[in-house]
Amino acid sequence: MAFEVFEKLEAKVQQAIDTITLLQMEIEELKEKNNSLSQEVQQAQNNRESLVNENEQLRQEQNVWQERLRGLLSKMDEV
């Protein structure tokens, strides 16, 4: 009877070890995925900053062109 108890205990311990091993593997996979996603987020933030800067530059250029156009229209009105 004691032998059966030890066999059951051994089976439970082995099952616990297997579960822990699987969970550790899953944790490693999730860490890798997390790192990958963090890099993607960083890249997206960098892209966003670039686009914001480009947008600001284009807005400034648009303002310059609008001022030039207004100036030309004013000169045409004077003629």
From Swiss-Prot:
Q: How does it assemble?
A: Homodimer. The ends of the coiled-coil dimer bind to each other, forming polymers. Interacts with FtsZ.
Q: Where in the cell is it found?
A: Cytoplasm
User: Keywords on this record?
Assistant: Cell cycle, Cell division, Coiled coil, Cytoplasm, Septation
Q: Which family does it belong to?
A: Belongs to the ZapB family.
Coiled coil spans? 4-78
Give the protein's biological function: Non-essential, abundant cell division factor that is required for proper Z-ring formation. It is recruited early to the divisome by direct interaction with FtsZ, stimulating Z-ring assembly and thereby promoting cell division earlier in the cell cycle. Its recruitment to the Z-ring requires functional FtsA or ZipA.
Name recorded for this polypeptide: Cell division protein ZapB
Annotated Gene Ontology cellular component terms: cytoplasm
Pfam families in the record, alphabetically? ZapB
| Biological process according to GO | division septum assembly; FtsZ-dependent cytokinesis
